[in-house]
Design a protein with these regions (language model features):
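Conserved alpha/beta-hydrolase "acid-adjacent" motif
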Residues: 224-230
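Short beta-strand/loop motif that positions the catalytic acidic residue
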Residues: 211-212, 217-219, 223
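N-terminal cap/lid segment of alpha/beta-hydrolase-fold proteins
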Residues: 21-47
């Protein structure tokens, strides 16, 4: 009997995985610096077939295949919400050179993905945004009109502006007033001069305050990349927001991705359905 139960659970799990895989479409979306590689994950059609869509924005040096974001997409799909995971320019499978990436051109990338989502036949016009680290900053600075119904920021790295002002990014020192053509980061990636110059002057919170819809912030108190005080500042300017401080969790929530994915998904489901 126990073997039959386990076999049944295994088959059910495999069926869910098969449904998820069959409803994922790889697409290319024109971005600020070339084509953006993206994956559109749709739920099973119900009723009119129209559903909300959440767009997920990865962090600095990351990509759309980060396990936490895939977990969020799968959870949303099972609750009738579509998602788009994409690589910013110069990242993952997208076109562009990492050296030419800046926060402003990532904002433009995200705007174009939002426009793409709104044109999809299956979209009902309600959009959710989720961003991690620098992706969280990009989400917070992207123009959000009435179509944006919910925003989730995971460890938003608004510290990037102060890093540029100090001339210290990931421990690499440079002259912030007159930076070189590029600085080489640990791991070999090259951070371009334009990134530094634009980060130096980013009006992060001055822009983010324009959004006053539902927002959810998750930040680890053990984050050594972007201190949680940056999320506290978002909480102060967004009156309709919740802040969850996770005791001793790191910047990537490395040992807790399932928990963070559940928290983020539940918030988006609540506000998009």
């Amino acid at each position: 009997m126990m073997k039959r139960i386990l076999l049944g659970l295994l088959c059910a799990s495999m069926s869910l995985c098969a449904v998820a895989q069959n409803r994922v479409t790889k697409v290319l979306i024109p971005g600020a610096r070339g084509l953006l590689a993206a994956e559109v994950q749709m739920p099973e059609n119900k009723g009119t077939g129209k559903c909300p869509i959440t767009i997920l924005a990865h962090g600095f040096g990351g990509d759309k295949n980060w396990q936490l974001m895939k977990l969020v997409s799968d959870s949303l799909q099972m609750h009738g919400i579509a998602s788009i995971r994409f690589d910013f320019n110069g990242h993952g499978e997208s076109e562009g050179d990492f050296k030419d990436m800046t926060v402003p051109n990532e904002i433009e990338d995200l705007k174009r993905v939002v426009r793409y989502a709104l044109q999809l036949d299956g979209c009902n016009g309600k959009i959710g945004l989720l961003g991690h680290s620098q992706g969280g900053v990009v989400v917070s600075m992207t123009e959000m009109n009435d179509t944006i119904s919910a925003v989730t920021l995971l460890a938003p790295a608004a510290v990037l502006r102060e890093d540029a002002i100090r001339g210290n990014t990931f421990g690499v020192l440079y002259n912030p007033i007159n930076p070189p053509e590029y600085v080489e980061l640990p791991g070999g990636r090259k951070l371009g001069r334009e990134y530094i110059l634009t980060a130096f002057r980013l009006p992060i919170y001055e822009t983010a305050i324009r959004y006053q819809g539902a927002a959810f912030l998750i930040h680890g108190t053990g984050d050594r990349v972007a201190p949680y005080s940056y999320s506290e500042r978002y909480k102060n300017i967004w009156k309709n927001s919740e802040l969850h401080l996770m005791e001793e969790y790191d910047h990537g929530f490395s040992r807790h991705i399932e928990e963070i994915a559940d928290l983020a998904s539940n918030f988006l489901i609540k506000h998009l359905l």
